[in-house]
């Protein structure tokens, strides 16, 4: 007997008889894969792949002799924060124009207006550029400083340090790339309007003053948030997740980590956990860091300036530190670290590309590459496809396949329409109305559907989920994995055995959307209903992954779980003779 014949006669029939157990095995393997990733045998050590960076290999000279410049900048920033409530940023931008014009640098105040349904915002950015003495204005580096962070805390030390550094940088002739300094009045709307105008894009929601100051291709950049708070902290928090789950090149983080930790002895905060230069990490801490990184990447909400730049092929990080008193903060130590970072980025001959763009950072020493974590979601997608096949082979041959397919397709359209209807409001009553409306649609469908129709609808649904999860995982692994976990009960609904257990799975699937929203509310520290937030980010920031996944993967399960529940409930008895489990 040939191998092909053996597989066809023996293996395939055996697998077909035990599809349910094979599907269950794949699901357990896919879910447990994540718990293997933080082990020492799997993780990789962080290292700089781009040899041209040479992080920390230069002498820094931003020292106490520049204390007069730093002191005057801090005094001015403190004055601007006191005047902000009455005159806004007008006084600050006027003073900045005088400062940089006296230095011989071009300046511009860019006004912009954000208009979307339910929200309107008017603001302005300040832009200046230090031309490279040894460059030809074809490449540049970016230094961004939001005047306030996303919760309204002033960034006095950050603005003062940026002014002092640009004055200091002007005295050196080693720069081969222009240095663009942008000060935003808002950490989200400001970068959005700046990028839209810098790349000559048009959008119906943003109107802005055209940029007169331009430079070459932006290679990389940093955003400084040295926010003034009641508590002082010497820990540097590094933010790197961007919209749609995008990430900057890993070499940018490696450069920051090596310079700030090894050369200037700053502790680093990643995903809410602090790490010191000489400290290690345990399996438990790495697992917690991995989960927090996955949740943050899955949400991909825009709260800092760096989040919008990777979609324009600009590698960007936000460096955040809490400063109780800007005048007692060690500006020179932090400024030397920024100087060393920009000196390293100045060595680049091309865009960062040698290292990874898909990864999870576990601590200051280790990360997980895409080749190690992707099998988990692909195994889960395979289990969904097996579930679709299990329901498919059980249908009667003479049944009209277009009928259940039409039900499935119409359910998707109803869900998308319902999402757009409620995306302009944050009231909880709107969310309840959405839930009840989709539930009512599911009840209506169940009155016209037989159990065979419901089983085929479930087959179509699982097949589409498998394909969509596989595609989304290549763009945002975390989001696809979280959604796959929420949909696990759906794939174990069975019309052939154990009706009570299948009814329980249908109920769990029905409430999975509510659980999903509550989890997001905890992560975002915001309202229970983030529909309006997602719609705003979709229109302004091209953040399309979350709303599209929610419309296509999560909300339809309200309808499908209801139809499956009532089809199972109305079934007179569980079938005992089945083709397969």
From Swiss-Prot:
Pathway: Glycolipid biosynthesis; glycosylphosphatidylinositol-anchor biosynthesis. One of its GO terms (cellular component) is GPI-anchor transamidase complex. The keyword Transmembrane applies. A motif (Prevents secretion from ER) lies at residues 577-581. Keywords: Endoplasmic reticulum, GPI-anchor biosynthesis, Membrane, Transmembrane, Transmembrane helix. It is found in: Endoplasmic reticulum membrane. The keyword Membrane applies. Residues 39-366, 425-427, 489-500, 570-581 are lumenal. Residues 1-17, 388-403, 449-467, 522-548 are cytoplasmic. One of its GO terms (biological process) is attachment of GPI anchor to protein. It is a multi-pass membrane protein. InterPro entries: Gaa1. PANTHER family: GLYCOSYLPHOSPHATIDYLINOSITOL ANCHOR ATTACHMENT 1 PROTEIN (PTHR13304:SF0). This is GPI transamidase component gaa1.
């Amino acid at each position: 007997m040939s191998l092909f014949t053996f597989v066809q006669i023996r293996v395939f029939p055996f697998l077909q008889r035990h599809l349910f157990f094979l599907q269950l095995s794949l699901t357990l393997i896919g879910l447990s894969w994540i718990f293997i990733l933080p082990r020492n045998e799997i993780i990789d050590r962080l290292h700089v792949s781009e040899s041209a960076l040479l992080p920390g290999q230069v002498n820094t000279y931003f020292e106490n002799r520049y204390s007069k410049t730093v002191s005057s900048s801090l005094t001015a920033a403190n004055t601007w924060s006191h005047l902000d409530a009455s005159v806004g940023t007008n006084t600050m931008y006027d003073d900045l124009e005088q400062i940089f014009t006296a230095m011989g640098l071009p300046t511009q105040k860019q006004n912009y207006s954000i208009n979307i349904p339910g929200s309107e915002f008017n603001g302005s950015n300040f832009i200046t550029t230090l031309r490279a003495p040894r460059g030809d204005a074809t490449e540049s580096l970016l230094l961004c400083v939001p005047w306030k962070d996303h919760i309204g805390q002033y960034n006095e030390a950050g603005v003062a340090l940026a002014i002092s550094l640009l004055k200091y940088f002007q005295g050196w002739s080693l720069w081969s790339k222009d240095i663009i300094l942008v000060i935003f009045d808002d950490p989200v709307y400001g970068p959005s309007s700046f990028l839209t105008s810098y790349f000559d894009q048009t959008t119906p929601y943003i109107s802005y003053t055209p940029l007169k100051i331009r430079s070459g291709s932006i290679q990389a950049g940093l955003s400084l948030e040295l926010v003034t708070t009641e508590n002082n902290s010497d820990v540097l928090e590094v933010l790197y997740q961007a919209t749609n789950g995008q990430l900057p090149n890993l070499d940018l983080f490696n450069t920051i980590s090596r310079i700030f930790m090894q050369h200037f002895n700053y502790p680093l905060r990643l995903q809410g956990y602090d790490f010191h230069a000489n400290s290690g990490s345990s399996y438990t801490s790495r697992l917690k860091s991995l989960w927090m990184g996955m949740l943050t990447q899955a949400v991909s909400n825009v709260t800092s300036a760096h989040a919008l730049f990777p979609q324009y092929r600009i590698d960007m990080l936000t460096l955040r530190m809490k400063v109780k008193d800007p005048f007692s903060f060690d500006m020179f130590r932090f400024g030397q670290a920024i100087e060393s970072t920009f000196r390293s980025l100045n060595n680049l001959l091309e865009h960062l590309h040698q290292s990874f763009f898909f990864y999870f950072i576990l601590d200051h020493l280790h990360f997980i590459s895409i080749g190690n974590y992707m099998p988990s979601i692909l195994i889960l997608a395979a289990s969904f496809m097996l579930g679709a096949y299990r329901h498919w082979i059980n249908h009667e041959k003479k049944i009209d396949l277009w009928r259940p397919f039409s039900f499935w397709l119409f359910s998707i359209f109803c869900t998308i329409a319902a999402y757009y209807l409620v995306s302009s409001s944050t009231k909880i009553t709107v969310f309840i109305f959405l839930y009840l409306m989709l539930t009512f649609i599911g009840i209506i469908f169940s009155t016209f559907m037989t159990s065979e129709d419901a089983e085929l609808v479930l087959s179509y649904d699982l097949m589409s989920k498998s394909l969509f999860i596989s595609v989304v995982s290549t763009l945002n692994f975390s989001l696809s994995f979280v959604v796959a976990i929420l949909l696990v009960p759906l794939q174990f609904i069975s019309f052939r055995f154990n009706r009570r257990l299948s009814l329980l799975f249908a109920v769990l699937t029905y409430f999975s959307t509510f659980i999903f929203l509550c989890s997001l509310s905890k992560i975002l520290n915001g309202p229970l209903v983030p529909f309006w937030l997602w719609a705003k980010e979709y229109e302004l920031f091209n953040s399309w992954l979350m709303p599209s996944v929610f419309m296509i993967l999560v909300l339809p399960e309200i309808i499908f779980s209801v139809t499956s529940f009532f089809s199972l409930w109305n079934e007179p008895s569980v079938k005992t003779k089945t083709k397969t489990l």
